[in-house]
Swiss-Prot record:
One of its GO terms (biological process) is hematopoietic stem cell proliferation. Interacts with (neddylated) CUL5; promoting association with cullin-5-RING ubiquitin ligase complexes (ECS complexes). Does not interact with other neddylated cullins (CUL1, CUL2, CUL3, CUL4A or CUL4B). Interacts (via RING-type zinc finger 1) with UBE2L3. Interacts (via RING-type zinc finger 2) with UBE2N. Interacts (via RING-type 2) with GFI1B. Interacts with GFI1; prevents its ubiquitination and proteasomal degradation. The modification Phosphoserine is found at residue 353. This is E3 ubiquitin-protein ligase ARIH2. A zinc finger (IBR-type) spans 208-270. The gene is ARIH2. Ubiquitinated. Ubiquitination promotes proteasomal degradation. Zn(2+) 5 binds at residues 297, 300, 315, 318. Changing residue 257 to A: Does not affect interaction with UBE2L3. It is found in: Nucleus; Cytoplasm. Zn(2+) 4 binds at residues 257, 260, 265, 270. Changing residue 100 to A: Reduced interaction with neddylated CUL5.
Length: 493
């Protein structure tokens, strides 16, 4: 199958956030170029039997609308308020403090109910409580004489006038604070229940903001819930067991890690990927690598631009086959062990000067970063290839050269390629921070095997007319099994 290398992928549109919407809006049509689409519709196209059917990324989750999430939260709150004999607002503060783990709350309540309320910051700690030292009927903020009925306080009895409370709450809500609105007294930890704050907000606009911030804080504190990070998306993801696993919103199709809400990053764990991304953003030395799109052919020295995702390059002038990453001859590149992904440590570096160690550290970082960035660029180029395949299939169907079913395997191959390369990209931060030893050697071996099969698949996808369907689907199966094996052995978070 030949494809036009100049066409571009389309952009996806995102819907506005509307927490008051009663019904879910219809899902938008999938954009074939989106990274979020990598995992869709692939599993059914690669036959799995026995142990091969095990998917290390399998993870049960549910997508909830705003109303469904609110209903689930209110159900917990109503039940707990009834058992603890507290107001609904206080019950919510207790739930937030204990991450909505009701069984733990009830156990603590049975053992020491007073301490539970202190820990939830709804009652003062008797041993540390400092009563107000201001004259009676005086506001402790503006120091004005105030009628008793205009003085308001929480359980700590720190009294302030209604005007100061209104100003305090309004400023905090404008700054995006929800559950965090607290007593104005210095060093007083007590939080204000929502039924205390709402009457103090002067207009409906602020009250609506406060509702949204409360909902955000309630969801973020719940150990089984995460807000979808998609732009203006109101959906909430619910799981039974919180883990660093891939979830996807069924409204905006955003794919992310449930635990950290960042882009899905298996096999790298959440803390490591944060460290890696911070390092990439901070290190100015990477700028030259980010902008590098061309290299010289190692045989005839003609300048070559990479316009596809495959790292198996063929010079258009001399027809020399070489690796884009290391410029090695492709014929001997992966004959026994795919060396291109493995960094060779200098065993004597600990005995050398600090300057030499710094140079070695930079060399190591650039080695991994260049490969990380190269696969990122390959993903973007292969997304364009996917779009062109999609358009080519449409053209063939319109010309009665087969049905969608006949050509669907080409799209599935491009999707699986992106899925595998996406995993491969995130193996490089994992390897960069990994301690040397037998486990790292095993990881590098599996990483190399995966990379070799991905490049074989990429080569065949970009030259689909030269390979029959069985050959392509066999390569898909091999690449996916390499990917699953690596994740099964190393994605243990």
């Amino acid at each position: 199958m030949s494809v036009d290398m100049n066409s571009q992928g389309s952009d996806s549109n995102e819907e506005d956030y509307d927490p008051n919407c009663e019904e879910e809006e219809e899902e938008e049509e999938d954009d074939p170029g989106d990274i979020e689409d990598y995992y869709v519709g692939v599993a059914s196209d690669v036959e799995q039997q026995g142990a091969d059917a095990f998917d290390p990324e399998e993870y049960q989750f549910t997508c909830l609308t705003y109303k469904e999430s609110e209903g689930a939260l209110n159900e917990h709150m109503t039940s707990l308020a009834s058992v603890l004999k507290v107001s609904h607002s206080v019950a919510k503060l207790i739930l937030v403090n204990f991450h909505w783990q009701v069984s733990e709350i009830l156990d603590r309540y049975k053992s020491n109910s007073a301490q539970l309320l202190v820990e939830a910051r709804v009652q003062p700690n008797p041993s540390k409580h400092v009563p107000t030292s201001h004259p009676p009927h005086h506001c402790a903020v503006c120091m004005q004489f105030v009628r008793k009925e205009n003085l308001l306080s929480l359980a700590c009895q720190h009294q302030f006038c209604r005007s100061c409370w209104e100003q305090h709450c309004s400023v905090l809500v404008k700054d995006g604070v929800g559950v965090g609105v607290s007593c104005m007294a210095q060093d007083c930890p007590l939080r204000t229940p929502e039924d205390f704050v709402f009457p103090l907000l002067p207009n409906e606009e602020l009250r609506e903001k406060y509702r949204r911030y409360l909902f955000r804080d309630y969801v973020e504190s719940h150990y089984q819930l995460q807000l979808c990070p998609g732009a203006d998306c109101p959906m909430v993801i619910r799981v039974q067991e919180p883990r660093a696993r891939r979830v996807q919103c069924n409204r905006c199709n955003e794919v992310f890690c449930f635990k950290c809400r960042q882009m899905y990053h298996a096999p790298t764990d959440c803390a490591t990927i944060r460290k890696w991304l911070t390092k990439c953003a901070d290190d100015s030395e990477t700028a030259n690598y980010i902008s590098a799109h061309t290299k010289d052919c190692p045989k005839c020295n003609i300048c070559i631009e990479k316009n596809g995702g495959c790292n198996h390059m063929q010079c258009s002038k001399c027809k020399h086959d070489f690796c884009w990453m290391c410029l090695g001859d492709w014929k001997t590149h992966g004959s026994e062990y795919y060396e291109c992904s493995r960094y060779k440590e200098n065993p004597d570096i600990v005995n050398q000067s600090q300057q030499a160690q710094a140079r070695e550290a930079l060399k190591k970082y650039l080695f991994y970063f260049e490969r990380w960035e190269n696969h990122n660029k390959s993903l973007q180029l292969e997304a364009q290839t996917y779009q062109r395949i999609h358009e080519k299939i449409q053209e063939r169907v319109m010309n009665n050269l087969g049905t969608w079913i006949d050509w669907q395997y080409l799209q599935n191959a491009a999707k699986l390629l992106a899925k595998c390369r996406y995993t491969l990209q995130y193996t490089y931060p994992y390897a960069y921070y990994m301690e040397s030893g037998p486990r790292k050697k095993l990881f590098e071996y599996q990483q190399a095997q995966l990379e070799a099969e991905i490049e074989n698949l990429s080569w065949k996808v970009e030259r689909a007319d030269s390979y029959d369907r069985g050959d392509l689907e066999n390569q898909m199966h091999i690449a996916e099994q390499r990917r699953r094996t690596l994740l099964k052995d190393f994605h243990d978070t």
